[in-house]
């Protein structure tokens, strides 16, 4: 049975040592593993001992990788698991590492979900539907997601949706009232808000143009349509412009008035 003939510190990593069996280099381990397995000069090691020691060292190395990954921000269990797999850590070691991390409270999917909802609803303005999908991708259970989202009240959602709507209004000044409403709805759906929240937000948003603003928007869209269809006053080009403006949400009366003025 081989025995340890030498233990030497590594030059480039003071936390690791090299183990020599029968005067030949065998493997290296973390100092904590050295202590855990009581490795010392003269100790005999059989094949199973070596396998167990190397497994313990794999766990220790993986644990350090996980701590480094967690040092930047909170992570879900799945995020850490995926990271360790990419780093080449064995599945059996990952299972033990995750258990250790949870035991030390470095991993807690309930706290992660709550923090994720709190942060992203404020910084990115995301609605519940988007937050739910993102947390699912991070491996959070449905029950924990719903629990985290319960802090995002209906009134808070409407308030957030109204802020989004106001941003759309500032950006889309050349649209008809109908198109502006559609733009707001589409934006809020993409952000992850429910139709009930969107409906409530629209009631608190002044998206309808006054007569002057609607006419100004129509003229801008009308000039654009005339260039596109080569408007020459003919029935054919007039109908193309008319259909274009109608699809944009302008009233027939306003469109006819515009075209009559253009001749």
From Swiss-Prot:
The keyword Repeat does not apply. GO terms for cellular component: cytoplasm. Keywords: Cytoplasm. Gene3D superfamilies: Winged helix-like DNA-binding domain superfamily/Winged helix DNA-binding domain (1.10.10.10). Pfam families: RecX_HTH1, RecX_HTH2, RecX_HTH3. The keyword Repeat does not apply. It comes from the Bacteria. One of its GO terms (biological process) is regulation of DNA repair. Belongs to the RecX family. NCBIfam families: PRK14135.1. This is Regulatory protein RecX. The lineage of its organism: Bacteria, Bacillati, Bacillota, Bacilli, Bacillales.
């Amino acid at each position: 049975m081989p025995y340890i003939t030498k233990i030497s510190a590594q030059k480039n990593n003071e936390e690791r040592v090299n183990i020599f069996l029968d005067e030949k280099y065998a493997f290296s381990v973390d100092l904590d593993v050295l202590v855990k397995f009581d490795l010392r000069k003269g100790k005999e090691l059989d094949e199973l001992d070596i396998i167990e020691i190397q497994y313990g060292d794999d766990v220790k190395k993986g644990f350090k990788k996980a701590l480094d990954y967690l040092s930047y921000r909170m992570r879900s269990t799945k995020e850490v698991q995926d990271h360790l797999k990419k780093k080449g850590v064995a599945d059996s070691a990952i299972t033990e590492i995750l258990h250790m991390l949870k035991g030390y409270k470095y991993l807690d999917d309930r706290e992660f979900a709550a923090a994720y909802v709190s942060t992203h609803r404020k910084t990115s303005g995301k609605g519940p539907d988007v937050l739910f999908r993102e947390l699912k991708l991070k491996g959070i259970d449905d029950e924990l997601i719903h629990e985290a989202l319960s802090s995002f009240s209906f009134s808070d959602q409407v308030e957030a949706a109204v802020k989004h709507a106001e941003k759309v209004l500032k950006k889309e000044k050349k649209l008809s009232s109908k198109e502006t409403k559609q733009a707001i709805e589409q934006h809020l759906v993409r952000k992850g808000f429910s139709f009930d929240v969107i409906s409530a937000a629209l009631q608190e948003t002044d998206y309808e143009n006054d007569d002057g603003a609607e006419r100004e928007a129509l003229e801008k869209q009308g000039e654009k349509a005339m260039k596109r269809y080569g408007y020459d006053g003919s029935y054919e080009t007039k109908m193309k412009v008319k259909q274009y403006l109608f699809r944009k949400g302008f009233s027939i009366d306003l469109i006819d008035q515009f075209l009559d003025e253009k001749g």
